[in-house]
Structure formats: structure tokens, C-alpha cells
Curated annotation (Swiss-Prot):
Keywords: 4Fe-4S, ATP-binding, Chlorophyll biosynthesis, Iron, Iron-sulfur, Magnesium, Metal-binding, Nucleotide-binding, Oxidoreductase, Photosynthesis. The gene is chlL. [4Fe-4S] cluster binds at C124, C158. Belongs to the NifH/BchL/ChlL family. This is Light-independent protochlorophyllide reductase iron-sulfur ATP-binding protein. It comes from Synechococcus sp. (strain WH7803). SUPFAM superfamilies: P-loop containing nucleoside triphosphate hydrolases (SSF52540). Transmembrane segments: none annotated. Binds 1 [4Fe-4S] cluster per dimer. One of its GO terms (biological process) is light-independent chlorophyll biosynthetic process. ATP binds at G39, I40, G41, K42, S43, T44, K68, N209, R210. Pathway: Porphyrin-containing compound metabolism; chlorophyll biosynthesis (light-independent).
């Protein structure tokens, strides 16, 4: 169960969604939460990273935490029903569900779940995420999983959508080399700073996406203590893979650009498995970002 607590210690003056300890994910599992500005390519990054982990022989579970429920369609090649949709069909009697009702097998055996969310303007997405993890534990679906990836809605870092941070070992932030994306990244760093006081989550690093250059990201990283873990340029093959509803690992093997992107995802996955050193980054004030970024 999830409850709302007043003024907890993990965010000054904030109201956060606090998870029941019984829904914690096993310690030996690598849990990654992927955040970033809305539309920056988090789902593409998450799905290709899941595919890369599977290529390295890992058992992978990807959990989409967006009411749009489009996180996993390149893995499953279709839009799958959400946990909320399935629970509504059984009047929220979760004991009536079977794993195959809400977990779908995707590319190379990656297990896919879409938590969904409440209707617009109602409810709490964090509650839905918590209930999804609880349901997975009830069916013992996390016991044989090596890697769990949470693909989280936009750059929303309220108590609800910060809920995946309570399960994660690392947070990866997807950004482009522009002001708006980096501004959103700074807000996410602030959320990690708050959650890290009471939870195990730490910053893993930055994924530069859809960017030929990284000069602005590099400025921000140097100032805050972040690092770039992977760099994906604006490669047309990535866009085409979304249109084909597949991962980059299912695209043309003879395309050199495809091969380069695959290698970068495999390198990122291996680095995360090698117990990447967590970062102690410090967020900037809004005015400091305005002064920092841009051309001299």
C-alpha cells in the first residue's frame, strides 16, 4: 500500500509518496530509473538499453511509468494493456490475475510492463507505480530478474512520479545539448539530492541524445559534478526504428550507423553492470543555469 506523509525528511517542506517497505526490489537486482525532459527520447533509450542488457545475457524487466503507455512498444512491437486497465477488468482484485495478464515478452526475452496511470487530473501516478511493483512481487516476477528499468514520465519530479527513485540504484538522465533539456535535468538532479537522503538511489550519469555536440552538456556536467555515460547523435536509424516499432538491434546489420549505436548501447549497459561509481552532483539555481549556458 502507498500512503501520503506530511513533510517527510527526504524533501524540505514537500509532500511525498512513501512506499511500503514490503514492495522493495531485491538487493542483488540492478534497478535503473530513466528520467529526462518530455519528448527527449527516454522510451527509445530505455528500450534499447533493455535490449542491450538482454544481449549481454541478463534477464531484464522494463516498467513503463507513463499514462501514454508507449514505453515498451519497440520491444513488444505493439501497444500492450496497462496494469491499471487489467486491474479495472477484475474490479482491482489482483489475486485474480495471472502474470501473463500484465507482463508481456518482448525482444530477446525482455519482460515488459506498462503501469499506465489514472485519468488526466485525477489520482497519483506514483501510487500506480507502487502498485505495479507490488503486483510483480506478489507473483514472484522480480526474483529471477537481473535488471529492472523504470521509464518515467517526462521531467515530473513530484512525490508521485519520483516514486521509482525509491526502488532504484541509479538514475540516468536523458538530455539534449539545449537549454530546455539541461534546465529539466537540473530539476531532476534536485529530486535525486532529496531522495538520496533516505534511499539508495544515486546519480549514474547523463545520456546525451539527439545531439551532434555536447558542449553545453559538458559545461553543466563540469559545474555540477555529473558525467556523460553515453552519446547518441541525431541518427536517422534511431528515428526509423521507432517507426518500424522495433529496437535498434533489429535494424539493418549492414548499416554502419546502426552498428555504432548498438555498440554505444552495449557499452553503456556493460558500464552499468560494472558497478559504475555513483555521483555526488550538486544542482544549480535557476539563475546560475541562465548565466552558465549559451555562447560566449
Amino acid at each position: 500500500m502507498t500512503t501520503t506523509l506530511k513533510r517527510p525528511t527526504d524533501g524540505e517542506g514537500s509532500v511525498q509518496v512513501h512506499q511500503d517497505p514490503s514492495v522493495n526490489i531485491e538487493e542483488e537486482t540492478l534497478v535503473i530509473a530513466v528520467y529526462g525532459k518530455g519528448g527527449i527520447g527516454k522510451s527509445t533509450t530505455s528500450s534499447n538499453l533493455s535490449a542491450a542488457f538482454s544481449k549481454l545475457g541478463k534477464r531484464v524487466l522494463q516498467i513503463g511509468c507513463d499514462p501514454k503507455h508507449d514505453s515498451t512498444f519497440t520491444l513488444t512491437h505493439k501497444m500492450v494493456p496497462t496494469v491499471i486497465d487489467i486491474l479495472e477488468e477484475v474490479d482491482f482484485h489482483s489475486e485474480e490475475l495471472r502474470p501473463e495478464d500484465f507482463v508481456f515478452s518482448g525482444f530477446n526475452g525482455v519482460q515488459c510492463v506498462e503501469s499506465g496511470g489514472p485519468p488526466a487530473g485525477t489520482g497519483c501516478g506514483g501510487y500506480v507505480t507502487g502498485q505495479t511493483v507490488k503486483l510483480l512481487k506478489e507473483h514472484h516476477l522480480l526474483e529471477d530478474t537481473d535488471v529492472v528499468i523504470f521509464d518515467v514520465l517526462g521531467d515530473v519530479v513530484c512525490g508521485g512520479f519520483a516514486a521509482p527513485l525509491q526502488h532504484a540504484n541509479y538514475c540516468l538522465i536523458v538530455t539534449a545539448n539545449d537549454f530546455d533539456s539541461i534546465f529539466a535535468m537540473n530539476r531532476i538532479v534536485q529530486a535525486i539530492q532529496a531522495k538520496a537522503k533516505n534511499y539508495k538511489v544515486r546519480l549514474g550519469g547523463v545520456v546525451a541524445n539527439r545531439s551532434a555536440d555536447t558542449d553545453q552538456i559538458d559545461k553543466f556536467n563540469e559545474r555540477t559534478g555529473l558525467r556523460t555515460m553515453a552519446h547518441f547523435k541525431d541518427v536517422d536509424a534511431i528515428r526509423r526504428s521507432r517507426l518500424k516499432k522495433c529496437t535498434i538491434f533489429e535494424m539493418d546489420d549492414d548499416d554502419e550507423a546502426v552498428q555504432a549505436v548498438r555498440e554505444e548501447y552495449l557499452r553503456l549497459a556493460q558500464n552499468m553492470l560494472d558497478n559504475v561509481e555513483p555521483l555526488e552532483a550538486t544542482s544549480l539555481k535557476d539563475r546560475e543555469i541562465f548565466d552558465l549556458l549559451g555562447f560566449d
